[in-house]
Structure formats: C-alpha cells, structure tokens
Amino acid sequence: SKKIKFEGIFTHFYKTDNENITNKQINIFKDYINIIEKDFYPIIHIGGSKMVNYNVDFAKYVRCGISLYGYGEKSLKPVMKIESKVIKVFEIGKGENVGYQNGFIADKKMKIALIPLGYADGIPRNLSNNFKVKICGKNVKSIGYICMDLFMVDVSNKNLQIGDKVCVFDNANEWAKKVNITNYEILTNLNNSRTNLLID
C-alpha cells in the first residue's frame, strides 16, 4: 500500500551460538528487506552483541547489549566490579551460629567480618556459604545465609580492620556458574540504587 511508509525494520535471534540456525534467520530477514527496499530504504537494525560475528553488513545498526559489560565474547574483559567496606569485625566461639536459620555453625573459635551488601543488592541468596570476596588482596569465604543487607565472611587469621576495602564482585560468570543461572541475570539484578558500579 502506498499509504504505508516503512521507517525501519528489525529482528532478533534466538540462538546466536548456532551458526546454521542464525544464518538461516539472516537469509529470511534479508528476503523481507529485499521486498521492502523496492519501495523504501528503511533503517535496518539487527540482533544483539553476538551479531558482530556474522556477515550482517547490510544492517545499519547492531544492538550492543551484554558486550557493553564486557561479556559475550572471549576477547572481551568484564568492565564492572562491586566494592564495599568492612563495617564490623567480631569473634565467635565453637558451636555458635552465624546468621539466620543456623546457616553456619562454627566448629572452632573464629573471627567474622560484616559486609553491608545482600540479596537486596542483587547478590543471589543461593550463593550462601558458597562464594569468596577479596579483602586486602586476600580471598575470604562467605559464611551463613546472605541477608537482605548484609553478608558475613570468615576472616580468621586475617589482619584487617573496619573500613578495609572489599572486592565483592568482578566477574559475573563466576557467580552465574555457582548458582546455575546466566550472567545476564546476575548483571541485571544488581541494584544500582544502593550500589555504586565501578567502571574500569
């Protein structure tokens, strides 16, 4: 119809890790473009970050998504990390529990540090007792269930003090693998209203 003017056309791909499937989709999309371009020359927008690996030079735009975070391709490096600070250091004795529901019970005297981030900030709760952070360049293990606004780490035999910097997160793939979800879910669940994201 001459009353319809195409300003643009776009598509999305459902399995960009599979070249055969994706190339078939690209060819179908190109067929539609050839029909439309007989009358119009629309803006052509195609797929997301991984489309840079395909022959799509007929498109005007590619939507960069997760690649902006430094993920999706092996040649990219993560550009984001989350840092916090130690807000409290205290000792517990053998048999004492840490956090809700007896999520961790000490088998010896231990020194514990509190970090003021929790699942409200996007740390998956099923990482409880199953991830490490860096304090003063040393890896320390989380203990107990992650709380809404806090988590705890074992800093026994570590010389640290309140205010020391904590690197909580610098690679979404590590967390995603541990809890069997995608790095997309880790990244989009981070709560930037409470968390300052540091971009290298």
What is each of the regions a protein language model found here?
Residues S1-G93, N157:
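Active-site loop/helix belt of alpha/beta enzymes
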Residues E91-D200:
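C-terminal accessory subdomain/extension
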